[in-house]
């Protein structure tokens, strides 16, 4: 992560309830921030050097393709993200048991947000039905 403040803005746009619940300096003097709620958080710290090649998700290279989070209202989240200028990267999808939206943060990391339309785990986690 090159821009910790940018990541914090992205996460607080997606999750308005997120706050910096702790921060400090690591042994090498670099800043770290825990952003989230009292129950869960994401640990952020800056990269020490610029990578030789900018990583892009879904290209078969080492790295995280995307992180996914369950939300109660994916359309409200989508409106917040677009209003804040984040790029929608949602692939076509029309699953009967979930709504998914994807957004790139300012560093090109892809984040998935899913609203489940069923309480049944088998239906929620079905990957055989085609997304149209």
Model-derived segments and spans:
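Vicinal oxygen chelate
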Residues: 1-3, 21-23, 33-36, 54-132, ...
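Core segments of cupin and vicinal oxygen chelate
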Residues: 1-42
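Short beta->alpha connector loops
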Residues: 25-26, 49-50, 73, 94-96
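Short, charged/polar surface micro-motifs in flexible loops or helix N-caps
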Residues: 38-42, 48-51, 74
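N-terminal beta-strand motif that seeds the catalytic metal site of vicinal oxygen chelate
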Residues: 1-9, 64-69, 117-132
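A short, acidic/glycine-rich surface segment
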Residues: 20, 50-55, 121
């Amino acid at each position: 992560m090159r821009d910790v403040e940018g990541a914090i803005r992205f996460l607080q746009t997606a999750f308005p309830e997120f706050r910096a619940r702790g921060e400090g300096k690591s042994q090498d003097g670099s800043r770290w921030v825990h952003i989230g709620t009292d129950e869960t958080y994401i640990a952020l710290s800056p990269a020490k050097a610029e990578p030789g090649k900018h990583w892009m998700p879904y290209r078969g290279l080492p790295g995280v393709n995307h992180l996914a989070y369950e939300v109660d209202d994916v359309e409200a989240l989508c409106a917040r993200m677009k209003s804040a200028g984040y790029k929608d990267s949602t692939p076509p999808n029309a699953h009967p048991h979930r709504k998914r939206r994807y957004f790139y943060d300012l560093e090109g990391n892809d984040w998935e947000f899913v609203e489940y339309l069923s309480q049944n785990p088998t239906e929620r986690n079905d990957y055989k039905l085609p997304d149209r």
